[in-house]
Amino acid sequence: MNTNNLLLENKKAKFNYFIEEKISCGIVLKGTEVKSIKAKKLSFNNSFASIKKEELWLENLHVSKYKEGNIFNHDELRPRKLLIKKRELQRLKKFKEKEGYTLIPISFYLKKSIIKVEVGICKGKKLYDKREILKQKSIKKDLSREIKYK
């Protein structure tokens, strides 16, 4: 994935989860949703992917209504179907069956003017893991300040 084509990234996912693996997949969108996503009007809060009837669905993704849209504007929180190969879906099912694993959208990006979603197979971090990461960040910041002022 090229960073120039990155539309939006879920920064909270890296803090709240251990990302085991990333999978790129397509997404079924309506016209006004495409325009809103390209304008970066979406929110990842509490969004996740689930497997229903041999299909992968993205749930709780908030895509704001397109400001130029009319009465045919989309529902903001509707479930969106993710397009993925059957083999990858079977592999995701195996991970999902394990205790503590979940599927989280990591980023939205453009690939040849088509919007793609990067979904991560994630395991939740405990509170002490998050505290350890914050402690390491503060130590790095203090060291860089000391080096800068010497």
Swiss-Prot record:
PROSITE patterns: SSRP
GO BP, one annotated term: trans-translation
Keyword Cytoplasm in annotation: yes
Main location per the UniProt record: cytoplasm
Subcellular location: Cytoplasm
Pfam families (alphabetical): SmpB (PF01668)
Highest taxon, organism lineage: Bacteria
InterPro entries: SmpB, SsrA-bd_prot, SsrA-bd_prot_CS
GO terms for cellular component: cytosol
Keyword Cytoplasm among record annotations: yes
Alphabetized GO MF terms: RNA binding
CDD domains named among the record's database cross-references: SmpB
Keywords (A to Z) from UniProt: Cytoplasm, RNA-binding
Disulfide pairings: none
Family to which the UniProt record says this protein belongs: Belongs to the SmpB family.
Alphabetical list of PANTHER family matching this protein: SSRA-BINDING PROTEIN, TMRNA-BINDING COMPONENT OF TRANS-TRANSLATION TAGGING COMPLEX
Function of the protein: Required for rescue of stalled ribosomes mediated by trans-translation. Binds to transfer-messenger RNA (tmRNA), required for stable association of tmRNA with ribosomes. tmRNA and SmpB together mimic tRNA shape, replacing the anticodon stem-loop with SmpB. tmRNA is encoded by the ssrA gene; the 2 termini fold to resemble tRNA(Ala) and it encodes a 'tag peptide', a short internal open reading frame. During trans-translation Ala-aminoacylated tmRNA acts like a tRNA, entering the A-site of stalled ribosomes, displacing the stalled mRNA.
Protein name in the entry: SsrA-binding protein
Gene of this entry: smpB
